[in-house]
Amino acid sequence: MKRFFLSLVVLCIATLASAQLPTDSLAEKIIIIPHIAITSDIPEPAQNLMMDRMKRILLKNGIVDTSDRSRFVLTVKSNIINEEWTETVPPKYVMTVEFTFYIGDVESGILYADKLFRRKVASDSPEKAYMQAVNAIRVSDPEFKIMIDKAKQRIVETLDAREEKLIIEGNEYDI
């Protein structure tokens, strides 16, 4: 009987102690998923490679989820700035591509952070050159961490502001 009460007391103390631990911050709970739009200007062969890069970027920063549903997304837009064939033998295709990565809220349309990367590559064909440009994106680039941290901070600020607004509106209707 003593063991039973002792076990019960220990269990109660453990439960109370765990209830006093600080909860994770909202920023640590934010889930961002990679997304490439159907209307993307990224050539089809490079889309899978780009999706893999974006997943690895998010995974490296600890916020990727395997689900396809999230309010917050990392997406990319690409622009070919310059392209030309060299007059060498064999001829090479040279292109400069800008990749702009965005983190935003698909529900509200708010953009939280963006980052531009420019890559210049040369290859035998335009398709291979584009693939090289995507391959040149380093997932360990510290600029990605800065962009993601900035987005998380802005997301938390936005959600906190909305919460305060709801509380104020709710207090107006108190009886």
Predicted regions, residues:
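Amphipathic beta-strand/beta-sheet edge segments enriched in Tyr/Trp
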Residues: 74-127
